[in-house]
Amino acid sequence: MYDRKIKNYSNFFKVLSNDVRIKILFELAFSNKNYTYLMEKLDLKQSTLSNHISKLREYWIIYTLKKNGILEARLNRKVLSEYLCEEIFNPHKLSVENYELDKV
């Protein structure tokens, strides 16, 4: 179980380790944005933006919906909070006994 959880965290951080995806998150931190705005602001082609959005959606970091026929991206603050704060850095959620630690 812990190996699967560690792999999931590793993949989550891989998704975040891309400059363009971080820029997308910075834009969404202030307000929801439609795809056209993001393409223009970040100087991306539609296919490039879609690929990055799909990676972020894979881990529910963002979600999309149509508003008045326009596709809009939204930051999922709850998921980010769970991954970045509550889960990893909360000693009550994970215990050291479940990991093999190297002795120095």
List PLM regions with ranges:
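N-terminal helix-turn-helix DNA-binding core of bacterial DNA-binding proteins
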Residues: 7-48, 66-80
